[in-house]
């Protein structure tokens, strides 16, 4: 791989990170506290493809505070990303910015400064109401998420209500803005406007959780209108202990998506997902299947999701191909116990096979591997992805090494 001397330099930088002591809220009076927000993440990302490569070393910082009085709180948080090594293309689309560098591979972590969150929140008994620019992660983030993997977080200008009534949970959001990961230099793709409604209702019954959801997304921007859709579905999860130190985990989802609002196309496509895992002490083995369907030449899309979490870390399927996508995957993960020099040590490996949902095209396959541990208050993570193309995309290798801290 062509990660050259930068990998060595990054390892040296991550081996001696700046330490930060854990912070507690500052009590101003009996009723008033101020909780500071200080976060940092230094990351190297390398991309190796047949025609282009990339080397990116970026530093993301967040600073802010949450002021609480009784049931009311106000939170403000700024976020900035600095490109220390800029041999990468920050935008996978045309943009009037010198951060658009098509001679390099894409690493969508542009240099950026913005107001990440500013919100007013009220808590009353078992209910919470939040107004303003906020982080929203719904369920497994397949439909709506904050894209926490990227340096610039995705947030929403919205009003949200949450309630818990015995075993029942209710969650409703109305948003008018989707603040993307691309930042201030991305032109109209910095933020998408529209009318977005999210509703999730769940019930817990023994070891099982059942949720129903509805996502109605209507974009104002004409160039993005094809992503307007309505999605209705169900998701069930269960964690079942059996024998000594053994646990069975199950998850399944079904949804139906169709055109909505400003979308000029007519389609209706299904979503299916199923996963099973068996855990014994620190070891977990899992296998799963996910299908994003297609109809009338239009595939099911999830433009608000935390997409890096799904369908391989090489990010080859951020946009679902027109013929849909099937992902067959299996993996192993292990959490090491009692390693004093590397507390929290964990490792994982996953294999994916990708096919079309319509027809019999074989897109390719992918291996993912990761390892992480703690150095005092600093978390260290290494990740690797290798995609081998058959009929979709190109052979791609990616490597990440990062250190992060939260005060």
Locations of the language-model features?
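Beta-barrel outer-membrane channel/assembly domains of diderm bacteria
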Residues: 2-4, 12, 18-136, 159-165, ...
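Short acidic, gly/pro-rich beta-turn/loop elements at beta-sheet edges
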Residues: 48, 73-75, 86-88, 141, ...
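Membrane-spanning beta-strands of outer-membrane beta-barrel proteins
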Residues: 56-58, 113, 154-155, 194, ...
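Outer-membrane beta-barrel proteins
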Residues: 45-54, 144-151, 257-268
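Surface-exposed coil loops of outer-membrane beta-barrel proteins
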Residues: 88-117, 126-225, 230, 234, ...
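Detector for outer-membrane/organellar transmembrane beta-barrel domains
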Residues: 207, 234-354
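Short secondary-structure boundary segments
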Residues: 174, 289, 384
């Amino acid at each position: 791989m062509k990660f050259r001397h930068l990998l060595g330099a990054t390892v040296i930088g991550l081996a001696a990170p700046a330490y930060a002591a854990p912070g507690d809220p500052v009590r101003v009076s009996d009723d008033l506290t101020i909780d500071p927000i200080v976060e940092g993440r230094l990351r190297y990302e390398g991309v190796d493809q047949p025609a282009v490569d990339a080397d990116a070393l970026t530093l993301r910082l967040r600073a802010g505070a949450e002021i609480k009085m009784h049931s009311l709180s106000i939170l403000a948080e700024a976020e900035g990303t600095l490109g220390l090594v800029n041999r990468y293309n920050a935008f996978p689309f045309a943009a009037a910015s010198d951060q658009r560098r098509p001679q390099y591979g894409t690493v969508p972590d542009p240099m950026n400064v913005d107001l990440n969150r500013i919100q007013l929140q009220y808590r009353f008994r078992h209910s919470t109401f939040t107004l303003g620019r906020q982080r929203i992660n719904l369920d497994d983030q397949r439909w709506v998420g904050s894209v926490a993997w990227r340096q610039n977080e995705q947030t929403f200008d919205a009003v949200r209500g949450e309630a818990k009534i015995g075993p029942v949970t209710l969650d409703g959001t109305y948003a008018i803005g989707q603040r993307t990961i691309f930042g201030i230099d991305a032109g109209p793709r910095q933020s998408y406007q529209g009318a977005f409604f999210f509703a999730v209702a769940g019930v817990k019954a023994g070891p099982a959780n059942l949720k129903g959801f509805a996502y109605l997304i209507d974009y104002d921007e004409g160039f993005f209108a094809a992503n307007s859709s309505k999605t209705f579905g169900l998701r069930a999860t269960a964690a079942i202990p059996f024998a000594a130190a053994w646990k069975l985990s199950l998850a399944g989802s079904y949804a139906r998506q169709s055109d909505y609002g400003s979308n000029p196309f007519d389609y209706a496509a299904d979503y299916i997902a199923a996963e099973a895992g068996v855990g014994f002490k620190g070891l977990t083995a899992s296998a799963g299947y996910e299908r994003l369907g297609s109809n009338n030449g239009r595939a099911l899309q999830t433009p608000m999701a935390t997409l890096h979490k799904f369908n391989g870390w090489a990010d080859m399927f951020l946009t679902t191909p027109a013929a849909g996508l099937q992902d067959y995957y299996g993996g192993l993960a292990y959490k090491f116990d009692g390693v004093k020099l590397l507390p929290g040590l964990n490792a994982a490996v996953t294999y994916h096979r990708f096919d079309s949902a319509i027809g019999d095209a074989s897109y390719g396959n992918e291996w993912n591997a990761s390892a992480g541990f703690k150095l005092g208050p600093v978390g260290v993570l290494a990740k690797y992805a290798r995609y081998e193309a058959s009929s979709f995309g190109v052979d791609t290798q990616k490597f990440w090494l990062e250190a992060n801290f939260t005060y």
